[in-house]
């Protein structure tokens, strides 16, 4: 018939236990006959769909209407194939799939009838159809064979005798077949089921990780179905023979998935080999069928690799041959088996394209016999032609094939390489029966027999071997005759052979002691009832009596397997002889069976422990030991039964007869007593132990005496030296000079400053507790808690008081002794579910973490019952949540807790509202009653209602839920401070103060009026507002005032607090400039002016003369505080109220009524009036002079912002970036390959610093042979960044140019090495990745000479870079669109006077285009609409800015110093379970300290702004009427005002000096009172600076031209820095001569103010080292040390990333030295650097000015002398430059960008020249 395609079906099974335990997901979808698979690794990818003949959905339960049962599969596939078999076609069904996919279940099924597979159902229906046949002319016969292919070897599963591997042969007619494979005739389905069961038991299975009963072999169950029909008319019979092949393939597998090892791995390799070959065959057949219609010419690729595997060889006819074939692909639905399932689907899809040409097998036997006869005739003719006709001239069909000739042929074949046959049947008399194939006798055989005496076997063999092709012809003739005899075998003979094989199998099993049921099923193992036998005894009781050996009648031989005679019992071992012993079983006269043991010569055989050399009669129960290891017990059932009958009362032995009994018996009989031996051995060991112990004790005692003697000698030496040292110290003490008071003050200042530094301790806390924070977040994510944890720093300031529960215990004890607040590390808990934020201490975090772990463990135990989203989790024992109520307090403070909590929770009257002498008005009564009523509603406490029913609440016996805290309704909006200095004069003032949050954010403004009133004065009527007419009395007791815990007078002054509130070491504004004596003098001056000391005690000298009559000591004074309005408060706060209190009375507060907030429209009118009466004391006067009233504004959220963050349940916490912009990633240096490993040397004192401007270029080889710089893309717009646009596969060179100012210490010697590595496609560096490091060949390194006389140094080196040596795909291919390649470059350079190389590291960004691509730089939007992009060749470079420090090597120091340098383990890198769910989140590190520092400075600035605004408002209100004494009393406020906010004392000096320099006459902005208020030190410095400035500018700026005459403006570039301020002659204008104070004070402070300035690359351990104080040095180190002195410096280079904030950009004109021309350049100010470009389109930085080391000078006299308006000067260490702006406004903007303080001072001076009228 015509070709038909292979029918393909797929079937998906349910999840197995392994997949269920791993919570696998189903990735298979079926719709009709279409099957789709989803990629679990990329769910967004479209599913892959396949179409098959059948798609069976068996993943669900049978109740599913789409479920495909076993019967449905058989009805679709099996019935159709059975019908084809009855039609006469060959049929094949095979199952394919991965291991454990359900192939064996589909093909074989299970024992239950409803779960039978295709094979049992097909066999059963086959015999049903046969039995239902009513045609008498039809007869049927069924033959079955069952084989397995295991490790490419074929085994017969039905014949127990065929234990070896069968050979696969190929016959020209039959094709591939298995030689000697058993074909058993069956007459019923029961016979087939029995054979199938027997074969399945013999099949090889094993357990793997993916399948507990994995089929380790391919099984082929073959049914030969013959239909014979007798035609009565013609009396001819016709046959149709169908071959039904049912194949169960072994599962494909991967070693890593199945965990295969050893034998399992070898099996899997063979399985995969055969399945791979099967796939190749299927693919080849599919391609052949596809190409048949297109091209009929056979190609070389049409070869089908059938012979590559035994499986495909045997299935050749079934795959694309004469067969109807069906394939069932078994699928696993689990996502963890995605790759295997997809491979199976592709196999099945290819198999659909195979076409088989099946034909009906009409009478195959007759045709086959005829063809075989022709083949035999042809072979005989061939032998006769070769002269062997006398040997084979025999009719093969005249006799059976099983005679003695068969043995001859076998012997002949096995000995064909010998000349003599060693067999008993080869005597000359028997040679007549040894015909070829044992066919019938013939005249030829008689002639052969008559010539027996003359012809020998040797001659016949010689004739056959010597004849060409004779051996092969004999072999093929033998095969053909064997097949003919098999075909001519009648059906009855086949049945008899099958029955004989079955009887042999049962006999063999019975001989082994295995009982068989009547139906042929195995019953079990039994102990023989009559036959004597041996059972083994083993040391392991479980292994005893597992082996049973029968002693047969007659002789039973025991020996080794390689003995000459066959041994009945085969043993192995070193002491087992080839023939060890003989058991002789005979019957005596009485019929009793007697067994005698006869040992062979020199064999070791023991009976009951005695060695026997002569025959011994055995009794039942005797112990027999053969050799040394084989122990048996002899059992004689009949003999034992007879003895029990004779002595029925015989007691059973008290000890069981086992292996131990036999061994002990053997030792006893040989005279060895084990107990005695053990006791003897034990005594010997005890004696040995005692001897060794005595020796050890003696040795220990001797060592102790030796050490004691040494210690005594050392003690004497120490005492002697200590006496000498004491004598020396006494002498030295006599010579010491006592400290002066000034020296004591210096020591006290230094100790207090050292004690306040907390950088290291805070860093240790952050690093040491990071692992706890990470674990808490990981548990929160895994339990789906919407709670995030992150570190936060809290400092107890006026704006941000720290709750006492967050302070450590030891800190609380020493709090009163500490003059300035401490900073604590806390944990910010963001409850995204409830919209609340809490702060936990580290101890509380650790306590809660224990409960979290317990909760996590419980969740794992009862995961199915977890109710994360239920209501009970809000108030249950959940350690993630603090107790949350409907109203919350965010950022609580002691003041708020003290006033609100006490007023709302405590019902006792407040002393503020009820005192002995005060009259509480009705409004006050109403307020108090309202507050008492409000007490029941302000706090929602549900701990007693349902906490007991929550999980874990029963753990706490005290009834309090430890997971929740009480939180009040209102949250703190912000705080404001109002000073009371106007009460000194007294004048009324209305303040508009900023409401500042704890984070330094302005949340609104508050208008407050403060005025002194008479005692009986009525309050004004504000309309509908509140009118409070009562008077509250507040006491200011001197003793209580001094002892109370609030900021002291010294702390409230910014001059001290700004310095003392520093938490980072060396971060004080004046830390690098102001010496301790200057600091102490400043403190003393401030204290003298304010009338206070450091300890807070009052020194009120001349008090009565300085204050007015209204503030007499002891008198009553009344003043009024009116809260007018609040404005600018965000609408998210619903209700707003305000309360205020005094600092020392934080528990007594005055509160307004809440008002509805309608947004940013009209302000909220409180109009709350409060009269306050006090008794005038020294404390009160000092308070109104120096301290404010605290105003706190509260509200509650309508909807908390955290709710928006909590909408995503499983989002991991993100790192906080509140203040600093995201820093650009900087890589560590690439390790050198040619240099020794350099350790990070501890850096000591810094000798000098330089700014380096480095240009990086990558040049490519052009067709002209020159190397041209590659194009650089600068569209990012940020400085020091750019992308190299390179061509693929072109030679390149890397050029690096270093530019810096000339210095005596800095000389480049050579480039030691240039290395590149860390190739990646993302900016971040993967530290775990292993990348090849390539060292480049340096071709040139030299210093360049500038075209003009320049003071800068240009050092350039060039290296060859072959990118192919990296062997990186990223560098070898064209970069895909949108991707960039990053590479790290490190240059190791050698410097003079340095002990190790300096390292310059740069991350280079690249994009590779095709080799012939034309590359042009992209144009940004700005350039697109502008005048074009700069195409200058020198624009193709990337810039880097570096800071080079030349430092001394740090001394190891004292042990205390070494302890302070301890290495703290950063636990943030430690792994915790579940960390991978955090998606890259990390705990905050050292940067948090810097952010908090900036936060504190921001709060301090806001505070100082309010103080200054108050002072200016008061001064404007008083006008010129302010007396001198009152002006002096206000000086503390002035000294701590804006001038001291962002600068240090030196900045004030400079400002004053600058103003004096501008107008040295009496027409200065300050009047004579201001000048007289300067202290002597300030006057001295001001005079010195004035002289220098006046002297210089009177020279008409000539010295400026002289100092910079050796360079042009184009040379302005990196400025060499030195932390010192060098001294120069006053005759020359230099940076240090004109600005000695601002170099390291004002500019450095502004540098520190800007976060971008601190974005340097540093490791976690180095993050704080860059902020160390650099000691001042007066002269260059090399000049001081002398040129002949050998110097050992350590270079330290750090890359500096410019800030992203642009302060100002535009064009400026630069004055060229010694020239009247001005050069125009484009300037961008990114603090602390000024970047200079040729134009606004120039992308490359041509020069930089470091503002932290430069001085900006401005003088109107200078402009008048030079006749150049709008000019100012910038002085650096090496040069001075004149700059000119476009107009006056532009100049002010540039001055503000360069130096904000200078610009503010100028504006203030200009505003004072034209004073405005005072406003009231």
UniProtKB/Swiss-Prot annotation:
What are the Polar residues biased-composition ranges? 1640-1659
Domain FHA stretches: 556-612
Region: Disordered, residue numbers = 431-450, 1550-1570, 1620-1659
Its annotated compartments are: Cytoplasm, Cytoskeleton
Q: Name one GO biological process term.
A: anterograde neuronal dense core vesicle transport
**Domain PH: residue ranges:** 1701-1799
Phosphoserine PTM positions: 1054, 1057, 1416, 1454, 1487, 1573, 1603, 1610, 1613
Q: What is the protein's name according to its record?
A: Kinesin-like protein KIF1B
From what organism does this protein derive?
Rattus norvegicus
Q: Which gene encodes it?
A: Kif1b
